[in-house]
């Protein structure tokens, strides 16, 4: 008679992200972002792109995996970030998810060493502080274009925050000796502390300031 699955396979008592950090005590304070931040216990944050063709499928992707996916970007190509065009920078990470995974893991280890806190909780706080609540859109009336303030959906707020955190890290290590993991850790810590040195946090403040003037 075959043994039950619980006896045939090893089952850890607690699944930790990357085998190191628990998500049981991680708290999302922003009620609008809470349904879209996936914190399911998972050792390897990798969904194999199953969400790609599903509407709002990325809301089911683990938040750490979403950061890894943003790290694989090549940087801004149509506008300057930190005074530079960063097209094709960090191209060694493009399409190489395992390498991006190791970069994010190293960044989280740096955050844990510096803050003495769970790096996933620090990362969540950075997202909450970097997600703009208001933005502007262009409307045409009588052949004239106007900027109008609009509310930002929770999923887009999350997208903007993750994008700017990754771009801020790219800007910090652009053409200098700072590693990408170290730059990513510094960006996340600064955003979590609402430090104006954070690209993501300062960008959020700029977006909301422009939206406020367009009311």
Swiss-Prot record:
Give me any GO biological process, just one: translation
| Gene3D superfamilies attached to this UniProt entry | Ribosomal protein S7 domain
Recorded source organism is Thermococcus onnurineus (strain NA1)
Q: Which domain of life is it from?
A: Archaea
Gene Ontology CC: one annotated term: small ribosomal subunit
Official protein name in the record? Small ribosomal subunit protein uS7
**Record-annotated membrane-spanning stretches:** none
Subunit composition and interactions? Part of the 30S ribosomal subunit.
Functional note: One of the primary rRNA binding proteins, it binds directly to 16S rRNA where it nucleates assembly of the head domain of the 30S subunit. Is located at the subunit interface close to the decoding center.
Recite the UniProt keywords alphabetically. Answer: Ribonucleoprotein, Ribosomal protein, RNA-binding, rRNA-binding
Family annotation (InterPro entries): Ribosomal_uS7, Ribosomal_uS7_arc, Ribosomal_uS7_dom, Ribosomal_uS7_dom_sf, Ribosomal_uS7_euk/arc
Q: Which CDD domains match?
A: uS7_Eukaryote
Pfam families per the record? Ribosomal_S7 (PF00177)
Q: Which gene encodes it?
A: rps7
Q: Which GO terms describe its molecular function?
A: rRNA binding; structural constituent of ribosome
């Amino acid at each position: 008679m075959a043994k039950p699955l619980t006896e045939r396979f090893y089952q850890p008592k607690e699944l930790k992200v990357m085998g190191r950090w628990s998500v049981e005590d991680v708290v999302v304070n922003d009620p609008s972002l809470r349904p879209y931040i996936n914190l399911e216990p998972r050792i390897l944050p990798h969904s194999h792109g199953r969400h790609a063709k599903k509407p709002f499928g990325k809301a089911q992707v683990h938040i750490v995996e979403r950061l890894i996916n943003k790290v694989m970007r090549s940087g801004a190509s149509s506008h300057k970030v930190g005074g530079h065009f960063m097209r094709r920078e960090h191209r060694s990470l493009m399409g190489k998810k395992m390498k991006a995974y190791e970069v994010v893991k190293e960044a989280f280890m740096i955050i844990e060493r510096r803050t003495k806190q769970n790096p996933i909780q620090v990362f969540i706080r950075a997202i909450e502080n970097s997600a703009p609540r208001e933005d502007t859109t262009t409307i045409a009336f009588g052949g004239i274009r106007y900027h109008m303030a609009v509310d930002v959906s929770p999923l887009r707020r999350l997208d903007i925050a993750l994008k700017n955190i990754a771009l801020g890290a790219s800007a910090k290590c652009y053409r200098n000796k700072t590693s990408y993991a170290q730059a990513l850790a510094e960006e996340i810590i600064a955003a979590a502390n609402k430090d104006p040195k954070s690209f993501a946090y300062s960008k959020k403040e700029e977006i909301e300031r422009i939206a406020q003037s367009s009311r």
